[in-house]
């Protein structure tokens, strides 16, 4: 305990993922004994047939070692966006220890950074009214378990009296869970900013776990800390779609919503788009719209 406490005060001289004024980004990694250090990121060009661990679409770039044993690389100017990356140290995937911002995409982790001065400013916490993100549990009779669900309510919801709100059911992709849209997807920040700018109507956004066999995201369920696997049994067998009305019932029993088809929307990314389409087909009187496209996350 003493040594762990002392570690809090160790000087952290090295910075990494430094966004420079010209929108280039500089990475630093101290590994004096390493023979080769590379950076894999979604900002790098990917060679044909190249696959980097869990990094989808990532390219691989050699870093340069200086006399102090620090490996460094600076990108070309990058577009405004949220980016992810990891290091490859002598072929071993490694998180950047000098950047504490790490996201998990189901079974893989990567560091992230944001280049602003553009559309990615929507991903940032800005000085606007903020909504509330609640981690809730609902009981599924069909799946015979309690399941975790994330629900965003807009700024002012608690003080808005009897006002009722439209609802968006936002579904994640194969590698995600109920936390995906609020971590990597920056859903709460985007909603706060769009609503403040008058570009989105204040709404309630419901983000469930689309893996029917799971209670909750890894580390949040009764299974404790276990090694997650990319695809759980039952993910694509229709159970999530079949019992989706249980989620609607929970939301409409606990929140002030406009409880009619015209004010319920559903959308999803990748697997979530597949689920959205099936739910809309199975329950045509329940939901007004369905967006199964992968470009759902586009905000410009």
Residue ranges and their predicted role:
Residues 19-291, 298:
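Non-catalytic cap/lid and distal C-terminal segments of serine-dependent acyl enzymes
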Residues 1-6:
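Bacterial Sec-dependent N-terminal signal peptides
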């Amino acid at each position: 305990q003493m040594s762990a406490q002392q570690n809090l005060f160790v000087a952290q001289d090295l910075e990494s993922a430094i966004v420079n004024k010209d929108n280039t980004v500089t990475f630093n990694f101290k590994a004096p004994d390493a023979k080769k250090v590379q950076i894999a990121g979604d900002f790098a060009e990917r060679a044909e047939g190249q696959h980097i661990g869990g990094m989808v679409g990532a390219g691989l770039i050699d870093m340069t070692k200086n006399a102090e044993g620090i490996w460094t690389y600076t990108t070309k100017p990058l577009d405004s966006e949220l980016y992810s990356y990891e290091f490859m140290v002598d072929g071993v995937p490694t998180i950047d220890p000098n950047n504490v911002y790490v996201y998990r995409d189901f079974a893989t982790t990567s560091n992230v950074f944001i280049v602003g001065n553009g559309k990615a400013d929507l991903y940032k916490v800005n000085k606007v009214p903020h909504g509330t993100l609640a981690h809730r549990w609902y009981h599924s009779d069909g799946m015979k378990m309690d399941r975790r669900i994330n629900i965003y309510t807009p700024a002012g919801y608690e003080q808005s009296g009897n006002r009722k709100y439209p609802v968006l059911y936002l579904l994640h992709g194969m590698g995600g869970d109920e936390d995906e849209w609020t971590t990597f997807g920056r859903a709460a920040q985007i909603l706060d900013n769009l609503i403040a700018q008058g570009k989105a109507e204040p709404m309630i956004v419901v983000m469930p776990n689309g893996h029917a066999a799971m209670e909750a995201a890894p580390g949040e369920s009764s299974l404790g800390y276990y090694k997650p696997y990319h695809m759980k049994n039952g993910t694509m067998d229709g159970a999530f779609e079949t019992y989706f009305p249980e989620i609607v019932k929970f939301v409409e029993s606990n929140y002030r919503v406009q409880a009619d088809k015209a004010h319920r929307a559903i959308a999803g990314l990748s697997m979530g788009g597949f689920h959205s389409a099936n739910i809309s087909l199975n329950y045509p009187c329940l939901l007004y719209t369905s967006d199964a496209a992968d470009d759902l996350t586009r905000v410009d």
